[in-house]
Amino acid sequence: MKKIEIEPMTRLEGHGKIAIFLDDKGNVADAFYQIVEFRGYETFLRGLPIEEVPRTVSTICGVCRAVHHTASTKASDGVYGVEPTETAKKIRELYLNAHYVEDHCAILYALGLPDFVVGIEADPAERNLVGLIKKVGVDVGKTVLKKRFAAVKVLEMLGGKPIHPVAGLPGGWSKRITEDERKEIEALAKEMVELGELTLQVFEDVILKNEKLLELITADYYRVVVNYLGTVDDAGKVNYYDGWQVGIDTKGNEVFRFKGKDYLNYIAERVVPWSYVKMPYFKQLGWKGFVDGEGTSLYSVGPLARCNIGDMNTPKAKEAQEKMFDVLKERPIHYIMAYHWARAVELLNAAERVLELAQDPEITSPDVRAELGEVTGEGVGIIEAPRGTLIHHYKTDENGIVTDANLIVATTHNHAPINIAIKKAAQHFIQENKEINDKLLNYVEIAYRPYDICQACASHALPGRYPLEVLVYDSEGELIKTIRNF
């Protein structure tokens, strides 16, 4: 049996590979997406005081640091049996939504959209952020980078550091927002809203007005019919920070809803021998293997899942969400390329929410931390990360020292559907007597990019470093320097 390997996988966070197995006729028999980074953080956290964990887990991933910090801080509330103050909750939500703007922007422009804007079969040297800017215009590129920095600035103001935050504490937040800071955040939020509107306009001008790309988005070989999991508030609107975790089936019917550690009653994880990452599924439906379609127990999380489950909680984003359903003519939407569209909708939603919270008079209250209670020995923090539902679950001894940790991240939730998506694409494009080249294989690679894979988060990589070698050549082609991290 012939084997094709795509390694490294490109334009994603972390390191993984795709293994495609062909039968004797040259058709695809099977395909696997493998995360090759080793799982380590859950063991590493044991022995730490719970109040140190939020700062520590932010180092799991430099891109996803804000969500691990926030989910872990929520879990630490449970360990100390404390309900954060309303102001603290709003600051945390403000922080999380600013991260959404920063993250969704980076994923769309640097990782997801180059395939569509530059071209799926374009030279890989051009099919990137720089190539995208050449296509949409330097002025647009400058505007995007400037307005994305507005979100980074808010993250630095609230989190204490732009990359690995330190402000989250059990029961609240370590620093209040002054009136001057509130005004600055409000001004920055208005720039973020403009970024959201611009992104949806770029999506419409470049993709929706192109019939071939629209056909690609709605192609059956990029369609994975599974269940969905996401978080909504009591009114059924999407909420990234808090609410009910809701599971729906392939037709959009609610299967269950839960909060906190009840997740153990609804989500099970299956270990497979070829990956360091487990395969979650809806527990009450039982493991049915790597199959999609009605009756499957597999599910997806993330922007498209959230849009399928609940309505956007801000006006402009709600209007954009409704347009997506109108154009694609289904809800729930199962076309995986629509993840990019849903991500653009959420970028605007998060920006609008940052502006709403910045204009909330309670956001500057000095009441940012509640008094801690007795150590309960267990805490669960669940939020919606940009990539999807994120669960941090800790157990401690009577002194608040971590004895056990379980982290279920978005890429883990999506692991099985990603494998199905890759296999479907491979079976469609790799066939008997067909030349296999880089252009063709990119049609397989674009099947995983909508999920915004983060390998480091999924494997909780430790030490989080992949062997890397950089060769520097001069203008004459002579090797002048070699840089290694191993």
Swiss-Prot record:
It holds the Pfam family NiFeSe_Hases. It is an enzyme of class 1 (oxidoreductase). Ni(2+) binds at residues 61, 64. Keywords: Cytoplasm, Metal-binding, Nickel, Oxidoreductase. One of its GO terms (cellular component) is cytoplasm. InterPro entries: Ni-dep_hyd_lsu, NiFe-Hase_large. SUPFAM superfamilies: HydB/Nqo4-like (SSF56762). Belongs to the [NiFe]/[NiFeSe] hydrogenase large subunit family. Part of a complex that provides reducing equivalents for heterodisulfide reductase. This is F420-non-reducing hydrogenase iron-sulfur subunit A. It comes from Archaeoglobus profundus (strain DSM 5631 / JCM 9629 / NBRC 100127 / Av18). The gene is mvhA.
